[in-house]
Amino acid sequence: MLKKNIFIVVLLLFWVRIQAQEDNSVFQFLKLPFSSHAAALGGENISIIEDDLTMAVHNPALLSCVADKTLNLNYTLYIAGVNAASAAFSRVLGDRSTWAVTAQFVNYGTMKETTSENIITGTFSAKDMAFSGIYSYDLSDYWSGGVKANLIYSNYDKFSSFAIGVDLGLNYYHQNSDFSFSMVARNLGGQIVAFEDKREKLPVDVQVGITKRLSHAPFRISATLYNLTDWKNSKFFDHAVIGMDFLPTDNFYVSLGYNFRRTNEMKVADSSHWAGFTAGAGLQIKRFKLGAAYAKYHLSTSSLLFNLSMTL
């Protein structure tokens, strides 16, 4: 009980500390979905209880659900031809603890370098990287907590930056009712080396989420509130994501999601052209798990995310 209370107090203290932060942060790639399942449920989910290592990147407390010696590989085809790859590996420590390591790489390709008169003077490349360690602990039969430490590096042409960040997660799960509640504070930390003279903030994100499986139907409903420290020029639903899983068997799911902010920000001529809608599916074949997600961002832009996990 004491450890559970400590985790709750720490999360609340960080909530108060970052309420005044402005949305002028760097390392925006940290907001990209790591999990195809989370991406399929609207892009944000911190409360799905599954043996899914990728979900522990969204909420480190969920690492307690992951099997020993799980290896995960991911690939994302993002908007504008941006490519991202990531990997993770987990180990169980005793009855209550689990640890994992992850790596993420985003490649923006080669771009033209031009003057203010649009004269091409050369080319340059840009990339982002993050390396993380995750630890989770079962605080009781219902509560679990987790922490994720991140080493973050970005390089854009002649400019580079290095930062250290921490994610904190807490989850409550009642197995009999199949109800899950989570709180997460992500990207707490700062730059060690700035791009230029002035240090900039990390994209801090406080989230709360719930997931409930229906008792007499093969459906699971999720709702997540995110970016709760920044309410400038935004309404309540701009912070909301909803999603639903169809679970005909224990080894297969189909997901649909909706992100209200994406719809509002990407409207063209009073039409969203399906921006904000997401979909995906997952399949388990023995010790292998496959997942895929599609997300619509704009009339002409979308993304695809693929996960492959296996138990060694």
Residue ranges and their predicted role:
Residues 1-22:
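Bacterial Sec-dependent N-terminal signal peptides
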